[in-house]
């Protein structure tokens, strides 16, 4: 039988991809685990891949970056939370910051600065914890897929640096810690947080059943009504402007994730992972620029319908156009390599101008 004729052990070839060394009696050759392995052996291969990792990769201590400052025992947990991937924290935190700044600029009466800072602190903490818990949950669900993608094979669960039971308990504690913050916020915020948690739990399953898992990420737009409710501002008072700002956040999130996920398209096709980058790989430029146009119009109308004027249009909308146009031109013309660094710099520039325009609008209020 197949299990008797073949035994497998993982090796690493020159391009960093896992190969499987197959021993068939006296013959020995290295084969691609997906393409070259006899079909009857594949279930055995998958089971053994789950149990075997490169022993040298279980524990390592980075010599540079944020992870290098952590004790060796905590490095896998830092990797699990993606503390060294600032872009993800930006994507989760900036909607709350924008929501608070927008509320301050459009509220019926000028909100006190100490209240704004208090809510900014609480919602920033929430966004950091939600992002961290979401990453850990995503790795728990995707551990088998991560072992088949070269970019994700070194993640702590995929390489066996953290056990699945330990990661499960750790993830549950993170979600519980995040939910405890809503003891200090209005009840409506807890309801909106529950919606965000639901979609965070749903997200890793999306790539298995739909070509549009990025659309699940639009739930991050709930940060806008949550920020408004935290300050006692009712989104329904200016429902159209609130909806426009939610559309703005949603399209920006989907746009960045769409461009970022291009780097895995070839391997996603082999493994069978679904995404918008895979589905629209032949027209991804058109889709990306369309999302960019929608986000720009949504931001513009969200401000105008909320009573904002020249400072918002010049700085917030203008900065968004310059920042994301630069990002798309660089990323779509030069390919997926280095997309994260380009996204961080361009998005940071855009965010500064978003807040500058909204901050000026708040400052000039009587």
Curated annotation (Swiss-Prot):
A molecular function annotated in GO for this UniProt entry is:
4-hydroxybenzoate polyprenyltransferase activity
* Listed transmembrane segments: 97-117, 121-141, 164-184, 215-235, 239-259, 287-307, 308-328, 346-366
Which EC number(s) are documented for this chain?
A: 2.5.1.-
Q: What class of enzyme is it?
A: transferase
- What cofactor does this chain's UniProt record say it requires? Mg(2+)
Q: Which CDD domains does this UniProt record tie to the protein?
A: PT_UbiA_COQ2 (cd13959)
Q: Which domain of life is it from?
A: Eukaryota
Query: What keywords is this UniProt entry annotated with?
Result: Magnesium, Membrane, Transferase, Transmembrane, Transmembrane helix
Q: Name the membrane topology term.
A: Multi-pass membrane protein
Q: Which reaction does it catalyse?
A: 3,5-dimethylorsellinate + (2E,6E)-farnesyl diphosphate = (3R)-3-farnesyl-6-hydroxy-2,3,5-trimethyl-4-oxocyclohexa-1,5-diene-1-carboxylate + diphosphate + H(+)
Got a GO cellular component term for this one? mitochondrial inner membrane
Localization recorded for this chain is: Membrane
GO terms classed as biological process: terpenoid biosynthetic process; ubiquinone biosynthetic process
Copy the pathway line from the protein's UniProt record: Secondary metabolite biosynthesis; terpenoid biosynthesis
Per the record, what phenotype accompanies loss of this gene's function? Impairs the biosynthesis of calidodehydroaustin and accumulates the intermediate compound 3,5-dimethylorsellinic acid.
What is the documented function of this protein?
A: Polyprenyl transferase; part of the gene cluster that mediates the biosynthesis of calidodehydroaustin, a fungal meroterpenoid. The first step of the pathway is the synthesis of 3,5-dimethylorsellinic acid by the polyketide synthase ausA. 3,5-dimethylorsellinic acid is then prenylated by the polyprenyl transferase ausN. Further epoxidation by the FAD-dependent monooxygenase ausM and cyclization by the probable terpene cyclase ausL lead to the formation of protoaustinoid A.
Could you share any additional remarks the record makes about this protein? In A.calidoustus, the austinoid gene cluster lies on a contiguous DNA region, while clusters from E.nidulans and P.brasilianum are split in their respective genomes. Genetic rearrangements provoked variability among the clusters and E.nidulans produces the least number of austionoid derivatives with the end products austinol and dehydroaustinol, while P.brasilianum can produce until acetoxydehydroaustin, and A.calidoustus produces the highest number of identified derivatives.
Q: What name is this protein filed under?
A: Polyprenyl transferase ausN
**What organism is the protein native to?**
Aspergillus calidoustus
Q: Which gene encodes it?
A: ausN
């Amino acid at each position: 039988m197949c299990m008797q004729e073949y035994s497998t052990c993982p090796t690493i070839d020159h391009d960093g991809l896992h190969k499987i060394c197959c021993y068939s009696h006296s013959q020995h050759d290295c084969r691609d685990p997906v393409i070259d392995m006899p079909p009857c052996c594949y279930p055995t291969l998958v089971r053994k891949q789950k149990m075997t990792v490169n022993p040298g990769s279980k524990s390592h201590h980075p010599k540079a970056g944020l992870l290098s400052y952590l004790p060796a025992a905590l490095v896998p947990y830092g990797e699990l939370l993606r503390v060294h991937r600032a872009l993800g924290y930006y994507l989760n935190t900036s909607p709350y910051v924008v929501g608070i700044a927008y509320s301050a600029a459009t509220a019926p009466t000028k909100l006190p600065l100490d209240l704004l800072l208090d809510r900014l602190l609480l919602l920033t903490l929430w966004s950091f914890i939600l992002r961290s818990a979401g990453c850990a949950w995503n790795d728990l669900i995707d551990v088998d897929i991560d072992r088949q993608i070269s970019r994700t094979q070194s993640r702590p669960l995929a390489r066996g640096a953290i056990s699945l039971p330990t990661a499960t308990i750790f993830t549950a504690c993170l979600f519980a810690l995040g939910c405890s913050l809503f003891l200090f916020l209005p009840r409506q915020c807890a309801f909106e947080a529950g919606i965000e948690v639901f979609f965070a739990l749903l997200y890793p399953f999306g790539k298995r059943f739909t070509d549009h898992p990025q659309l699940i990420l639009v739930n991050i737009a709930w940060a806008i009504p949550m920020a408004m409710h935290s300050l006692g501002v009712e989104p329904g008072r200016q429902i159209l402007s609130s909806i426009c700002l939610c559309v703005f956040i949603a399209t920006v999130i989907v746009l960045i994730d769409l461009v970022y996920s291009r780097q895995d398209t070839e391997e996603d096709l082999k493994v069978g992972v679904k995404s918008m980058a895979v589905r629209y790989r032949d027209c991804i430029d058109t889709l990306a620029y369309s999302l960019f146009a929608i986000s720009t119009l949504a931001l513009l109308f969200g401000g105008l319908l909320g009573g904002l004027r020249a400072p918002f249009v010049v700085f917030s909308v203008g900065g968004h156009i310059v920042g994301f146009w630069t990002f798309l031109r660089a990323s779509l013309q030069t390919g997926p390599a280095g997309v994260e660094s380009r996204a961080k710099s361009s998005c940071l520039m855009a965010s500064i101008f978003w807040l500058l325009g909204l901050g000026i609008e708040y400052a000039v209020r009587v």
